[in-house]
Design a protein with these regions (language model features):
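Solvent-exposed loop and capping/linker segments of extracellular ligand-binding repeat ectodomains
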Residues: 1-184
């Protein structure tokens, strides 16, 4: 696969992987060719829902050549780090989850925390980190889910029981403001 296979492909949102998360796949090559944000869903054939969902945030790559012809290669954004969590084309879930506490841009974190929607081999520490983020950033996460009209994501958030009374009221107000009767 060439390095430019997804060049100028800005509408790609999901990669559906027709395999289990334990299997070796071509996901490493795919996400390595995409610098924009993309979600990968491990959704085996014949199953009603994905077994695992992963988010690969966007990142930027800069290559600068100095007068001495030394190349300075820098990466901005956590997306590059997430794309390195593979060994022999198999996902390394512990390494993937260890990146989350290192910080993200505001938009990425609200999506990353929703990994609890399709968890796979989460350690207790990783689960707690995602839950803690959701508890303290419910409004931000709900705003993103409402904007995307992701009713299933909102149901998942409610089922995680991370919203206190104030957060629930804030969510209802956001849903009403977004004119989303189903979410309200």
């Amino acid at each position: 696969m060439g390095s430019d296979v997804f060049l100028n492909c800005f509408a790609l949102e999901d990669l559906i992987i027709r395999a289990t998360p334990e299997q070796a796949t071509g996901l490493f090559a795919l996400v390595g060719s995409i610098t924009e944000a993309v979600r990968a869903l491990f959704w085996p054939v014949g199953e009603a829902a994905p077994r695992a969902g992963l988010w690969y945030p966007a990142y930027w790559e800069d290559i600068e050549e100095t007068p001495a012809h030394i190349l300075l290669h820098t990466f901005s954004g956590q997306g590059y780090h997430y794309r390195q969590c593979f060994l022999e084309n198999k996902l390394l879930p512990a390494e993937y989850d260890a990146i989350f506490p290192q910080g993200h841009a505001a938009d990425d974190a609200s999506v990353m925390a929703m990994l609890l929607r399709w968890p796979w081999q989460l350690s207790d520490a990783a689960r707690d980190a995602y839950r803690d983020f959701l508890k303290t950033n419910t409004g931000r996460v709900l705003t993103r889910l409402l904007k995307a009209q992701d009713t299933e994501g909102i149901k998942t958030l409610l089922a995680l029981d991370v919203m206190d009374t104030d957060a629930f009221a804030e969510g209802a107000a956001l849903a009403a403001k977004a004119d989303n009767a189903e979410a309200a």
